[in-house]
């Protein structure tokens, strides 16, 4: 019985070992040509190493140096963070591996020095710090060949890695780590200056990483976009930045033109780009979370801007969550993408926080919070591709636009909805916009889209009249409709609070009229506005009218109690169709003391019901309206409570 039992156990052991892979200790670089499992215990040096497709290599004290490794579907097993691929490149792909940046010779020694070597003459040298360390440009180029084409790889940036500007790189951009055609890549940890460019990749997770610039965060000099680089900028003899509340006394000619000189500013290029530059490429299944970006041109970019969007692939199915952004030359988040969720992101000091650009649809921005902006968020599409911009919305977010970031020759806005699919509505809900400016800007909210709906929002607008003589107004219009392909752009405001205040003047007291219109069309063929349960209030006074030459104005159950209207002296000018119900108008009127200026057209239609007007309103219309087109019921003076019928 005992012999029989031993025989059965031996037979079972034989069957088990027959199915197990045999591990071979590698003797030399040419001994891995067959598919197998190889154990590397010493250094292997060669120009080219061929490994059997589908093999596994296990590092156990050895490494590979200076080789181009040719293999497909290679699994790599490393025990720790030491260097195992020293100056190597991969021709093929790896699978099912867990690797670290230092496995490829990257040196994690980036450090911050207390004294700046910034050569730009406007630098306050004693206050800024800069970063230095081993240049990892070559090592990162090597590791990119291993990650390109990979499947099911976990990659850790296990440290802080410096990369210097390369002579062949653009003046404002360090080299990118270029990763192509990978699937199921989880990348995490560490700090980089280099940006990462993913091309034709799917199921990519980037987490717990920091993307920094060459300098720690600092304010930028005033920047020209369309002005001449040779032009000196001063305001009343004071450097522009300080005159506008900036932190540093920049030299008189310390400003930049476009992206020229951003290397001197200490900026790095984009943090992460998902690039689909040709129609045969795509990037899908993107998840960027718990990352930090600072001192970059842009933070995360989904898709690239192109002159012909018919010649690009798709970026689809992306999440950007729980990320922070600080000091970006352009945009923390920009996209030409579909099916995107941006959630719980925050940042400060940027040109514009979020750009939902051409080709973007099914985009949700939720829980975003940004301060110190020049622009607010926008949806914008090239007119030829407007039909592909639809179903986008911003929710539960806040944006503060105070122009601490200085563009000298550009208008500003809090929200921009420019072009979109006809019949679609761009939605902004449960959000707060704070807009503060003492320099000329055309609008706070502008629209070229077919329809914009703002619901349950708060707009805090604080304006100053222009002081340097360049414009009689701080802004022309709070809500403006520009020239557009949309036949009749419309703004819908629902349960929204808008507070508009003029700032105090040092010589003449409170400024009475820092803007011309509340709503106006600037270039648009027609423009319609709808207000429902809204409260528009504040101390600022309008120079012309609240609603200027609208196609249609509908106001219901609202309170309008701003300072009043001065020059024309009426709230609503020349609407074609007007409907007001359950609304109170408060605020002194000027020249005409009239609620509505009647247009000289035959097909107008006006209806005013259950409305209360200010004591300064002596009549409803500038001219006697045609009763066939006018309906007035229960309109009263709020002081005398007397009815007004004409």
Describe the role of every protein-language-model region.
Residues 66-70, 163-173, 191-200, 214-223, ...:
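Short glycine/acidic-rich loop motifs that flank beta-strands on beta-rich extracellular proteins
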Residues 304-314, 319:
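C-terminal/domain-terminus segments
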Residues 1-173, 188, 247-250, 254-263, ...:
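Extracellular "leader-to-stem" segments immediately downstream of a signal peptide or signal-anchor
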Residues 53-54, 148-151, 179, 183, ...:
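Exposed regions on extracellular, virion, or secretory-pathway luminal proteins
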Residues 51, 57-59, 75-79, 155-157, ...:
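All-beta strand scaffolds that present successive hydrophobic residues in beta-strands
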Residues 69, 74, 113-131, 223-225, ...:
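Flexible coil/linker segments and helix-coil junctions enriched in charged and small residues
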